[in-house]
Amino acid sequence: MTFHETATRLWKSLPPDERLLAATAFFRDPSPELAGSALSALVKARRLRPQAARALPPDAQARILATVLDPGESLAQGLLVDLHLAERRPLLAAFLDALGLPHDEGVLTEETEPPAPVSPEAARDAVAALGSFPRDQVETYLNTLWLQDEERWAALSEV
């Protein structure tokens, strides 16, 4: 599987409806660390004053942000994570269950030791367990995981 090497490239590759789902999820509960970047992207995209962008309802903010193809690397990463946490928890849970990794509704639980990289065999088996999910969603999820920790998830690029 060929992965996009940056979150921004992955974000650009998503269809508009997927970007809207991600932006809507983001604005439901915006991360304080990324809220400023998101508002800056809105200001730039629509040439708005910052206070006007802040005053928009969340659904309008989401519609605008979904059209921004280069929101910046950290914001793109946050949007991708929000897409999966809001809309695709069953996919996340199925993947982590197949790997035997502890999680809470698809979110890895804190580990006391640094995580070991996933073996190519385990990655192949876990991806095979996701056969009931849409292929494009699986590929986006795997690419997002890989972007978060390339060393741990290196085997995913070989699947």
PLM regions and their residue ranges:
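Charged, amphipathic alpha-helical stretches
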Residues: T2-A35
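Short, solvent-exposed coil/turn linker segments
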Residues: A7-L10, S74, A129, A155
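Short, charged, intrinsically disordered terminal tails
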Residues: E151-V159
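Acidic, low-complexity, intrinsically disordered interaction modules
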Residues: D29-T144
